[in-house]
Amino acid sequence: GCHTNSKTKDYHCHKKKPPKTLGPQVKKENIKGVSFLDLKPESVSTNLMRLDYEGFTVWLDCSKRGAVKFQYNAQRDTGNFKRSNTFKLDPKVPEECQQLNGKTYGKNYDRGHLVPANHLDHSKSAIKMTNTMTNILPQAANMNRGAWLMTEEVTECYRDIDELLVVGGVIWGNDPSNDYFVKSHGVKTPDAFWKVIIRGVGSNERAIAWIVPNSAEATRKKTDDYIVSIEEIERVTGEVIPVAGFTKYDKSNPWVIPRGCNKG
């Protein structure tokens, strides 16, 4: 089963340990699918690949050629390895389960990270793995450098205060108007992304959650508009977020960036 370790605060599941390798271990795992923002049923396979990279995990839906969920622990920032400019496919993942190439998207869309490189900058190999295309999806440039970046900066600052559990995912939706990259990359463009950050334990547990639309309107100054309750995340995605009941039902106030936070 899955639980939070009372000493390390690490949320994990007991499974047979895979052999050590420089790349991820590919596992088949059944988890709940994702729903649309309007709660219409979405066609997401229940047979997902779990990819355990160094320091983070991604769940991949072969039918989408892309991820549906990600998770990692963000600990105190002790590193400064730089992000690579190279994006590559994962040789351990079947071709039919991932994008066609690692090239840029264009059309004002970035190669957007689910798990940001900066949060794995303690390890040269881990930060390199974040540029694997299984961790990348088309994100509107304004959103990737705006509201989504702001959620990453909140994580960056608060991980120096508490160890954080970060869980997030993809809301693929059903809007075909932005599916520019089906021919070039084999992947549709998600309609939104979600993220939950959890800190503290027991009565001190706190969490904040966002659903960020994948659009040019999702600028930095609108980040707080996208804060939702964890109950809403669970309702929209079908996920069960590992937080106490008292944390689920009210929207969090914004987590203010602490004065003097080093976002690098």
Question: Whereabouts are the PLM-identified features?
Answer:
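Domain-level detector for secreted/extracellular nuclease and nuclease-toxin modules, and
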Residues: G23-G264
